[in-house]
């Protein structure tokens, strides 16, 4: 009888495939989920959307998402646009959970925006050619679709978006209901470094007056595109598979100061032409999916400054006579440091020059 073959241990043992590691979902839900305390390596995703602010900004209005009919000036001197004809920026603030209980450490945790998925929602609604409006050919044809000038912009940051003012016509008079450049002059038709603002109000900053400031916004990432023309067809893409990385060349994303995330956008799809050939702006909402992580950073707030701000906040606010500025009533301030020999002239004029050297001004002779 032939000897039996030896069984090799483990030769026929099957191994189960190992799944690829992916982030483990801890919890999901509404904004109340942000109150859940998570570990230092936790990643948070926030989904939000911003509605357009074209002029009719109340959801119950019939023209919600549109502006009113654009009123065109007969001359530069009579350029007075109405508030409900001015597309404005949309903005929102999302309050994030407090990360630090002890602010006296040399390092603290801050929320860092890492990436964002975003897209304009409702592009398919522009296919509508039966809602009423100017006919393409005749009464038996469809109406002219939304077309013309388009503007798309969004921003994600740890601070409000910083704006630079620049207008097409400095003689335009904007209504008080919106934020415009104060005391506009011809220089505002170019870059005036004094025309600055913070995007701190929703639906108040007209797109035609303000744009993101390229010299600022170190803690914000913004993106935009513009297509001009009277009959230019709108061209927009939509997908849920494109991620925009918010990290800079140093691998750092926007750090959310005060544990707040700022979202802003403006999406003008074009103009709709009515039967009477008046035109209204059409805006669309934008969806955001922002990924945040916790980042260890050096504490920028010294304990001494925190204590000073705390104690100064305990003092009552007094409205007194001016002690600072142009009308300040402080006559003189003297600072003494260390000791010196008794000077023979107590009225010597002393100062520290730009090289940090102590200088003494010699007295002027009274001899004529």
Curated annotation (Swiss-Prot):
GO MF, any single term: structural molecule activity
Motif stretch (Bipartite nuclear localization signal): 5-14
Gene Ontology cellular component list: host cell nucleus; T=7 icosahedral viral capsid
GO BP term, pick one: virion attachment to host cell
Keyword terms, alphabetized: Capsid protein, Disulfide bond, Host nucleus, Host-virus interaction, Late protein, Phosphoprotein, T=7 icosahedral capsid protein, Viral attachment to host cell, Viral penetration into host cytoplasm, Virion, Virus endocytosis by host, Virus entry into host cell
UniProt xrefs under InterPro entries: Capsid_VP1_Polyomavir, dsDNA_vir_gr_I_capsid, Polyomavir_VP1_sf
Modification Phosphothreonine, positions: 339
Ranges where the record places region C-terminal arm: 303-368
Xref: Gene3D superfamilies: Capsid protein VP1,Polyomavirus (2.60.175.10)
Pfam families tied to this protein: Polyoma_coat (PF00718)
Compartments in which it is found: Virion; Host nucleus
Classification via SUPFAM superfamilies: Group I dsDNA viruses
Domain comment as written in the entry: A DNA-binding domain overlapping a bipartite nuclear localization signal is present in the N-terminal region of the protein and is required for efficient virus formation. The intrinsically disordered C-terminal arm interacts with neighboring pentamers. The unstructured nature of this region allows to make different interactions depending on the structural context: pentamers present at the 12 icosahedral fivefold axes bind five pentamers, whereas pentamers present at the 60 icosahedral six-fold axes interact with six pentamers.
Entry similarity comment: Belongs to the polyomaviruses coat protein VP1 family.
Subunit field text: Homomultimer; disulfide-linked. The virus capsid is composed of 72 icosahedral units, each one composed of five disulfide-linked copies of VP1. Interacts with minor capsid proteins VP2 and VP3.
Record function comment: Forms an icosahedral capsid with a T=7 symmetry and a 40 nm diameter. The capsid is composed of 72 pentamers linked to each other by disulfide bonds and associated with VP2 or VP3 proteins. Interacts with a N-linked glycoprotein containing sialic acids on the cell surface to provide virion attachment to target cell. Once attached, the virion is internalized by endocytosis and traffics to the endoplasmic reticulum. Inside the endoplasmic reticulum, the protein folding machinery isomerizes VP1 interpentamer disulfide bonds, thereby triggering initial uncoating.
Protein name: Major capsid protein VP1
Organism ancestry: Viruses, Monodnaviria, Shotokuvirae, Cossaviricota, Papovaviricetes
């Amino acid at each position: 009888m032939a000897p039996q073959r030896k069984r090799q241990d483990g030769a026929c043992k099957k191994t189960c495939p190992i799944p690829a590691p992916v982030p483990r979902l801890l919890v999901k839900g509404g904004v109340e989920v942000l109150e859940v305390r998570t570990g230092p390596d936790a990643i948070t995703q926030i989904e939000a959307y911003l509605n357009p602010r074209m002029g009719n900004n109340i959801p119950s209005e019939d023209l919600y998402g549109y502006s009113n009919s654009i009123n065109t000036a007969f001359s530069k001197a009579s350029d007075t646009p109405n508030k409900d004809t001015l597309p404005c920026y949309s903005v929102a603030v999302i309050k994030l959970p407090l990360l630090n209980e002890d602010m006296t450490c040399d390092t603290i945790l801050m929320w860092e925006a890492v990436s964002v998925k975003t897209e304009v929602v409702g592009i398919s609604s522009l296919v509508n050619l039966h809602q009423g409006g100017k006919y393409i050919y005749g009464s038996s044809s469809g109406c002219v679709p939304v077309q013309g000038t388009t503007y798309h912009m969004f921003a994600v940051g740890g601070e409000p978006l910083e704006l630079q003012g620049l207008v097409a016509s400095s003689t335009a008079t904007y209504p008080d209901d919106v934020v415009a450049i104060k005391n506009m002059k011809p220089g505002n038709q170019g870059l005036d470094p004094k025309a600055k603002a913070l995007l701190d109000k929703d639906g108040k900053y007209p797109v035609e007056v303000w744009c993101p400031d390229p010299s600022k916004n170190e803690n914000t990432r913004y993106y935009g595109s513009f297509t001009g023309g009277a009959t230019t067809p709108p061209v927009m893409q939509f997908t849920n598979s494109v991620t925009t990385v918010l990290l800079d060349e140093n691998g750092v994303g926007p750090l959310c100061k005060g544990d707040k995330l700022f979202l802003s956008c403006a999406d003008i799809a074009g103009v709709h032409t009515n039967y009477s050939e008046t035109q209204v702006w059409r805006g669309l909402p934008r969806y955001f999916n922002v990924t945040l992580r916790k980042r260890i950073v050096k504490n920028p707030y010294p304990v001494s400054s925190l204590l000073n701000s705390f104690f100064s906040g305990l003092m009552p606010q007094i409205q007194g006579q001016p002690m600072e500025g142009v009308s300040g009533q402080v006559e003189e301030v003297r600072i003494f440091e260390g000791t010196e020999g008794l000077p023979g002239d107590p009225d010597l004029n002393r100062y520290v020059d730009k090289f940090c050297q102590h200088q003494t001004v010699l007295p002027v002779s009274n001899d004529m």
